[in-house]
Amino acid sequence: MSDAIRPQPGILDIALYEGGKSHVAGIQNALKLSSNENPFGPSPKAKEAFLRSVHTLHRYPSTDHAGLRHAIAEVHGLDPARVICGVGSDEIITFLCQAYAGPHTDVVFTEHGFLMYRISALAVGANPVEVPERERTTDVDAILAACTPHTRLVFLANPNNPTGTMIGQADLARLAAGLPAQAILVLDGAYAEYVPGYDAGLALIEERGNVVMTRTFSKIYGLGGLRVGWGYGPKAIIDVLNRIRGPFNLSTTQLETAEAAVRDQDHVARCRADNARWRIWLAEALAEIGVPSDTSMANFILARFSDTEEAEACDLHLQTQGLIVRRVAGYKLPHCLRITIGDEASCRRVAHAIGQFKRMR
């Protein structure tokens, strides 16, 4: 490439995102517990909608996403005009950075927060500001102290990935109220459906004009392979995001499958209940053999080891047993492994394998 051809500032500072591993060399049918996927997959109704969509593949999709937006609004009690849909919640995050951040502005997030916050900030030339957490949990005071007149966006995953920890409504309200007037609080609710009774910040959005929420169909809805997400916020902000959204960013298959998925809340409830049961079981089983974790409110636990060497050695042992979990050194947690909550057999299998590893030490 010619020296005269250069990308915008910040682009070359982006480290390529690496998703959870899917395969282990020499191991057939390894069990993937590295990407926080729903072990039960999508709703049967969503699968039926997916198959029906093949009959209209020659047609362009809707540009306004009306069917999906209204379904989301009906289920959550929202104004459909204030719902925006994207290619995963990642795209909504990207839209927010494109619209509100840029050179000489700051984008704030916590030290163990989702990697896409940093990537999206750098992509628009903004300055990523990483704020320390307190025992792997969001520290509201630290976030507020990091805000300046340059702050434009504050991203907060609640529950957080990869820690699984979360803060309550009172702290969220205090954070929103304490931000500079020009800053938007973005509540990433990718794992919100795993928390009974949690509105992921919806009430806060109605009370304030500086809060936006993002959600995804990749987790409890089991549609990670389709890439569908959505956001909700003040009408003025959603209008801005729609101005930079591509007119055909979602296919008919994505739209109709996601609509069927969100309407099947019985499937969501079953998945949430099963996840809660086995998340508690796995955390307790690992704690008994000397592998603690913080209380997780998501569909994974963050297992803590004595040091980086032990975590990496355990990961290698699990791979020999056909089990794939996620190293999280990229999240500044090199002594930890993130383990997706699978079905009963998967949880028992991973607990047995880690117990076997600890006995060999």
UniProtKB/Swiss-Prot annotation:
Oligomeric state and interaction partners are given as: Homodimer.
Domain of life, per the record? Bacteria
Question: Any coiled-coil ranges, and where?
Answer: none
**The name this protein goes by in its record:** Histidinol-phosphate aminotransferase
Matching InterPro entries = Aminotransferase_I/II_large, HisP_aminotrans, HistidinolP_aminotransfase, PyrdxlP-dep_Trfase, PyrdxlP-dep_Trfase_major, PyrdxlP-dep_Trfase_small
Q: Which keywords describe this protein according to UniProt?
A: Amino-acid biosynthesis, Aminotransferase, Histidine biosynthesis, Pyridoxal phosphate, Transferase
Q: What class of enzyme is it?
A: transferase
- Example GO BP: L-histidine biosynthetic process
Which coenzyme or cofactor does it need?
A: pyridoxal 5'-phosphate
Q: Which reaction does it catalyse?
A: L-histidinol phosphate + 2-oxoglutarate = 3-(imidazol-4-yl)-2-oxopropyl phosphate + L-glutamate
User: Which NCBIfam families has this protein been placed in?
Assistant: hisC (TIGR01141)
Name the Gene Ontology molecular function terms of this record.
Answer: histidinol-phosphate transaminase activity; pyridoxal phosphate binding
